[in-house]
Design a protein with these regions (language model features):
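A short alpha-helical cap/connector motif
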Residues: 1-187, 191-245
């Protein structure tokens, strides 16, 4: 990595070079559109949870590269809810890519933000240290019973799944099952990756999870070009999923 002074000098030079028409479009239209789509998801969740209050507990985030969604969650929820925010990430980038998750955009080690860098970004954004917890490690190793018991019995108000890959999403969904309560919103950030193939990625992991647990009742919530959200309604076997917060 280049020293920070050289990086800043290079950025200054780049800012003085005229943008191409394509670069101007990406900066002016495409990037703000992607940001606004995700912001719409968070505002919709805030509206839903406020109308249906109280739904309290955790904001659980699986995949926290660059702290973008964590900071957006804080901005969207802090004025209305007393959530505790939990970032669960390898902080080493993507794991080794299994055959079922092959797509050109995914590479082992890609999308890496270190834990200290993540925390610095969040704290500079105004998130208090006592409202934010991190859990480090790849999900097939880090989502243990000990970690689960560390956070229970409090439930989740929001679960944000941004782990990209089918093989990463499987352990995430099994982990969060115990944190569901009536009104929990679960969001899939990469719902339409893998060409929206229902047999790939987060779509497949979600379908198989629902097939394994038919007693869990979810309803469609909101969607964008890439994200999809559901609401947990309750247990079909008779429980309503209400829990301690």
């Amino acid at each position: 990595m280049l020293p920070s002074g050289i990086q800043e000098f290079a950025r200054g030079i780049r800012r003085r070079i005229p943008l191409t028409e394509a670069e101007r479009w990406v900066r002016r239209d495409y990037t703000p559109f992607a940001f606004e789509e995700r912001a719409r998801i968070f505002r919709s969740i805030a509206r839903f949870l406020h109308i249906n209050r109280p739904v309290t507990g955790y904001y659980l985030e699986f995949g926290s590269h660059e702290a973008n969604t964590m900071r957006m969650a804080w901005d969207s929820f802090r004025h209305l809810f007393d959530f505790h925010y939990v970032a669960i990430d390898s902080f080493q980038g993507l794991p080794k890519i299994g055959e079922i998750d092959r797509q050109d955009i995914w590479e082992e080690g890609k999308l890496c933000t270190g834990e200290m860098q993540f925390l610095e970004l969040c704290h500079k954004h105004g998130m208090p240290a006592d409202r934010l917890t991190t859990v480090r490690g790849y999900y097939d190793e880090s989502l243990t019973e000990d970690v689960k018991n560390r956070f229970l019995p409090k439930k989740a108000a929001v679960v944000y799944v941004d782990c990209d890959l089918y093989l990463s999403t499987i352990p995430v969904l099994e982990f969060v099952k115990n944190f569901l309560q009536q009104g929990t919103v679960i969001v899939f950030d990469d719902w339409n990756c893998f060409w929206a193939d229902p047999n790939r990625g987060e779509r497949r992991a979600w379908r198989e999870f629902c097939e394994r647990h038919p007693e869990l009742h979810f309803e469609d919530f909101v969607a964008t070009s890439m994200q999809k959200a559901f609401v947990y309604v309750g247990d079909r076997s008779g429980g309503n999923g209400k829990g301690s917060a």
